[in-house]
Structure formats: C-alpha cells, structure tokens
Amino acid sequence: MYTNLTASSLLDLTVMQSEFEFKNWNHTIRFPVDGFALNATSRNDAANERIGKQQPNNRDMLYKLLTVYQPFNQVSNKANGGTIGNFETLHDGLHNSFGLGHMGIVEVSAFDPVFWFHHANMDRIFALYQYRYPDTWVEDAAQAKGTFSVARGAIEGPASPLAPFHMNALGDMWTSTTSRNWTSFGYTY
C-alpha cells in the first residue's frame, strides 16, 4: 500500500514505475491501493476526498495568480521563483491526487479521460491570465532541467520549438510565439 509516501520511497517509486500493471488493466485506474496489482481497482471516493482537501489552497492560489501581477516566467512554472504560486503547482497537484493510477504517471496519464478535462481547464485558466495580463509572455531563460529535446542549462525562449508538437506536415514545431493566441485554435471560453 502506498498511501504515506516518504521522500526516499518516492525515489524507489520512480524506479518501480515501469513495473506497474498498466498493460494488464483494461480500464482506467484512479488512486488504487496497490499500483502493482493485476486486479487493481479505482478508489474514486478517496481521490475525490484528496481533491476536496486541496480545494481551499488551490482556490486561494488561483485567486492570487489571477489578481496579483507576476511576470509570465514566474507564474508559469516552479523554477523561476514566483512568490504566490504558479500554474505548474496547480497542474501537478491534481495529477498527484490520483495517486498510482494512470493520472499519476506521465507516460500513461493521457489515457485517463480526467486528463483531458484537467488540461482543458488549465488551458482556460491560462487564457484568463493572458486576458488579464496581455503584455507579459515567455522570456529567454536557462532551463533548470533537461528533457528529451532540451539540454539542461539550454537557453529557451518564445521562439524555441515545443517538441514534439508539429504545427504542419513540413515538420515545423509550434513555439510559444506561434501558440500564444489561443483563439487561433478555435477555443472559446
């Protein structure tokens, strides 16, 4: 059972993720008692309880993010020292509420329909921030962590490619600049 994870057990958990039984589950699992069990079942009530307990903090953080100005590079992620929270913390908190199920593991989270509702809501929140503060945007910054396409320490900015997201059949990548206007995607809120 993995309900009270410690810092050291999180490292062990990261190593063991490849052993989860996703390939044997024929449906989405949320917050199972045991993510390694062939017959794991969702504990939706427990996940809902966890989300409910986070709501006051999430609501307060979101209110501050939308009413107290911070430059985009601070409000968008954890790496740049924002003082009132950031969108990444709001985003990650909901994924983590689902524990060892599909939403808790990056490689398979998009298989859970909740993922799509969650990300649509994060897009909406981001659009509200853009509407409120239209003059702040992505700035060049050294990357604190590397990814499969960006080296740690690389300088990334508004014109950097957002791999692996292709914007056309020629292989051109979306950038923060080309994706800045969310209405170009046909969205309305």
Predicted regions: what they are:
Residues 1-189:
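C-terminal accessory segments of proteins
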